[in-house]
Amino acid sequence: MEMTHYEKTPLIRQVFNNGKTNSWFYVKHEILQPGGSFKSRGIGHLIRKSNEEALSEGSGKLAVFSSSGGNAGLAAATACRSMALNCSVVVPKTTKPRMVKKIQSAGAKVIIHGDHWGEADEYLRHKLMAQESQHGSKTLYVHPFDNETIWEGHSTIVDEIIEQLKENDISLPRVKALVCSVGGGGLFSGIIKGLDRNHLAEKIPVVAVETAGCDVLNKSLKNGSPVTLEKLTSVATSLASPYIASFAFESFNKYGCKSVVLSDQDVLATCLRYADDYNFIVEPACGASLHLCYHPEILEDILEQKIYEDDIVIIIACGGSCMTYEDLVKASSTLNVS
């Protein structure tokens, strides 16, 4: 049986101890994707579509190249394994050994180069891919987030949510918001694409959650145009992009989306609390969105409306494999999280 590059994930009503007697929250569990995060959708879609095009042109199978210190590289490796493609992933020196092993275990060749993602990416594109092209191979560069075909793949999450709500006899007007974490804007862009395709982009507001220290979207909004962050300091390393995709920035204003910025301390506290409550370990990038489940007053404030008993909010638990429970405890201790 052929492996697929992504799976339909559960949309589960979860009750949070947040002072409300009834839960509004339905959580979409993208941590259950083959690559451990939502990135399996978009990156897998890009690789599959590009490989099919290469085969139809008679170019043979692709050689796939990804630069990522984390979840994008793992998603690329996992997708390539499902299609029997060679995959090379360049990671910076800051990448944790356990993540390197995860990517290797998924069948990819891992090269460690550079002090940050930018240096790893430059080495991948200008050195490794150039060498491979000289050998006559058809190559594919996989950006972690800024690619329209990747957004197309991510947009399937909206189609699934609509289908799952229908299966539970939940009408779409009951959905008052969709919450997702934002780094470079790949997931956000996919959600906007999916909502727009289903004529919902102007009906369901998207709440974009970032952490202070890598809040490039929020800073860009305040600036009135996209900015580039010179330094990324948040513990939510999977959100640490120096820039926001142009489509994400433009869509935010077009569709009346909302921006929330949280502290590292708040997000780490939520990650530990969620692990204790549900036995799910989520990294800070994912915990950022889940934080609003424990603190619905933030959501009501940003939406400028009360959320009532019959209303529903969708939370995208984006997943990620960058931190263990021990990592969360250590980071919490360092930042004096109570």
From Swiss-Prot:
Instruction: Give the SUPFAM superfamilies listed for this entry.
Output: Tryptophan synthase beta subunit-like PLP-dependent enzymes (SSF53686)
InterPro entries assigned = Ser/Thr_Dehydratase (IPR050147), Ser/Thr_deHydtase_PyrdxlP-BS (IPR000634), TrpB-like_PALP (IPR001926), TrpB-like_PALP_sf (IPR036052)
Q: Name one GO cellular component term.
A: cytoplasm
Q: Which GO terms describe its molecular function?
A: L-serine ammonia-lyase activity; pyridoxal phosphate binding; threonine deaminase activity
Q: Where in the cell is it found?
A: Cytoplasm
A GO biological-process term: threonine catabolic process
**Which interval of the chain is the signal sequence?**
none
- Residues annotated as carrying N6-(pyridoxal phosphate)lysine in the record are 39
The protein's enzyme class: lyase
Q: Which cofactor does it need?
A: pyridoxal 5'-phosphate
Q: Does the keyword Glycoprotein apply?
A: no
Q: What is its EC number?
A: 4.3.1.17
Q: Which reaction does it catalyse?
A: L-serine = pyruvate + NH4(+)
**Pfam families, sorted:** PALP
Pathway field of the UniProt record reads:
Carbohydrate biosynthesis; gluconeogenesis
Q: What main location does UniProt list?
A: cytoplasm
Q: Which domain of life is it from?
A: Eukaryota
Q: Keywords of this protein's UniProt record, alphabetized?
A: Cytoplasm, Gluconeogenesis, Lyase, Pyridoxal phosphate
Report if keyword Mitochondrion is assigned: no
Give the family, as the similarity comment puts it: Belongs to the serine/threonine dehydratase family.
Q: What is this protein called?
A: L-serine dehydratase
Whichever gene encodes this chain, its name is: SDL1
